[in-house]
Structure formats: C-alpha cells, structure tokens
Amino acid sequence: MGIALMFLLALYQMQSAIHSEIIETPSSYNDNSLLEAAAEEPNSRATASESDLLDGLMSTDNPNPEQQTELEFRYPISAIGIGYAKNSVVLRFQKHARKQNFKYDPDYEMKRKSLQDNFMHFGKRQAEQLPQATGPGYYECIKRSAMDRYGRDPKQDFMRFGRAPPSDFMRFGRAPSDFMRFGRDPSQDFMRFGRSDNFMRFGRNLNFHEELRSPKQDFMRFGRPDNFMRFGRSAPTEFERNGKMDSNFMRFGKRSGVMAKLTKSQLQQNKLTTADGKQQPAEEGNPTDKAISMLFNKHQQQQQQQQGQRLQQEDRQQMKSSAEQNNLEEASVEQFYEP
C-alpha cells in the first residue's frame, strides 16, 4: 500500500512539472497583454485623457483630497447594503431613533434590576420606558410613584387589591398560616397550608386503616358489629343460619289472600300430614328447608340400605356355616356306622 501511494505521488509531481513554467525574470508592466488589448480599442485614448485631467484637477485645486470623503449624516445608519445593479453602496438610516445616553446612571440601573427581579408584572411599564433623571418627565414620575408602585416599602406586599394590610388577598411574603385567606380571621382560615391533622376529616381518627378499632369508629371498616346497616333483621344467631330464616325478612313470592293473613302457627298446623299413623311435618315452602330435608331423607335412605345389606350378608354367612356343620356331622355318622 505504501509503495503504491509513493508511485502515485511521483506521477502527480511529474505531471505538475510538465505543465508548469518557471519564470526567472518577470516581464515589465508595459508587456502586459491586457494593456495591449486596451490600447488597441478606439476609445482608449479618450478614457486615458479624461482620467489624467481628473487627477490633475484633484492634485492642483484640493491639496487635502481625504477631507472630501468625510460625510455627516443627520440620522444613524441602521444597515449597509450593496446594490449590484448599479455597483453602489446602499445606506439605510434610522429616522426615529432614540437618543443615546452614554452616561452611567446608577439609579436607572437599580430600577432596571429591581424590575427584572420582580415577577408577575401586570400593566406596569418596562425598564426602557422609565424616565431619565435628565428628561422632562422625571419630576412627574416622582409624583406618580405611588401609582406606579416603584420602590415601595417591603412591608407593602405585591398584588394588593385595595384592602387593609391584615386582610390582603394573595399577598406574597406573609406568614405561612395566612396564605390564601379570603378576608377571614386566622382561626377560620380556608385552604391553609400546615393545618392540623384533623382538617376535612369525617369523624375519623389519624389511624384510619388500623384494624380492630373501637366500636365507636364504625364508618366503613372491616369487622364492624353484626347490627350495622341491617334492615329489619333479627339477632345475628337467626340471620342466614343453616335452617329456616326469619319469615318477615325480604321474602319474595309469598302467597297472597287468605294464606297471607294466617299466622305462622296456623300455617304449620295446616301443613302437618299423617303418614303410617304418625304425624310428620310437611316440607315447608322455603327452598333451603326443602333442600335440607331432601338431603336428610337421602342420607337416611342410604343408611337404611347399607344396614339391610349388612344384615343380608350376615344371614348368608350364618346359613353357610350351619350347612357346613351339618355336612360334617353326617359324614362322621356314616363313618361310625360302617361295617
């Protein structure tokens, strides 16, 4: 790679040496081809004579030609451009420019800094619009200082709406307890920061999510007593037990008419039926009672069937054992009476 690069550099140097021409002694100014072409033109003598005349007039009449280039403009230059069509320089002036004051004014700088540091200016003048100490409206500004609210006492806070200092609205820099007060007494502050822990609490304690609290704090907690928010229910022992529920608790589909007017004891007496000479209470209309009674009857039937099967198996075993004993006795008797 290095050998190829050196070869290319050598070729480039040879090419440049072939196309270049070393000039040891430069030619004179009169031998320039451009001047010779200009001299061959027909109007070359006229242009040369005019330039010579102008140079002669400037050298003879005006001994200081540099003063002719100095110009004084009435307005400051705002921009400088170039007109390529006319080959000229275009100057743009600022007609209504503010008169510059290059003197250092410490009061003006202090006012400017104070305005820059303040926040939330509503309709106040900017720092550039403040009257100068040498201007015509300086003394008028002093008279209107109360209106403009510049350089007030630190006790007079910003954004006051014509109220007395103790009842100011949205004043900055006051005590933390008096922030965003709506003309109220400090004891009746609304939306105060740093208020006590029991503010806007609905009868709750600080330890709201604590388990096993006292019965007095029964607002939406787990483990409340059984009689909380119950609608006409009986004692906890009779509510949703494995049996008959209370008849007057949200029963749907009850019969109307004569049956609805009967009492509970009369309904039970009417439902009693006789079977096999024994009085057995009929199944009540409650679906839970029906399901429980059906399960109980099925269980009793299964037990009876199992007991019957056991008794049959025992009887069969006894019969087998007795038959075997009889066979053995007969065989022994036959052997005894053989000749």
Swiss-Prot record:
Residues 319-329 have a biased composition (Polar residues). Residues 1-22 form the signal peptide. Residues 38-67, 271-339 are annotated as: Disordered. Residues 300-311 have a biased composition (Low complexity). The modification Asparagine amide is found at N242. The modification Phenylalanine amide is found at F122, F161, F172, F182, F193, F202, F222, F231, F252. It comes from the Eukaryota. One of its GO terms (molecular function) is receptor ligand activity. Keywords: Amidation, Cleavage on pair of basic residues, Neuropeptide, Repeat, Secreted, Signal. GO terms for biological process: adult locomotory behavior; behavioral defense response; larval locomotory behavior; negative regulation of heart rate; neuropeptide signaling pathway; positive regulation of cytosolic calcium ion concentration; positive regulation of neuromuscular synaptic transmission; regulation of striated muscle contraction. It is found in: Secreted. InterPro entries: FMRFamid-related_peptide-like (IPR002544), FMRFamide-related_np (IPR051041). Residues 23-110, 126-151, 205-212, 256-339 form a propeptide. GO terms for cellular component: extracellular space. The keyword Signal applies. This precursor includes 10 peptides that have FMRF or related sequences at their C-termini. In insects, FMRFamide and related peptides have modulatory actions at skeletal neuromuscular junctions, and peptides that are immunologically related to FMRFamide are released into the circulation from neurohemal organs. Belongs to the FARP (FMRFamide related peptide) family. This is FMRFamide-related peptides. It comes from Drosophila virilis (Fruit fly).
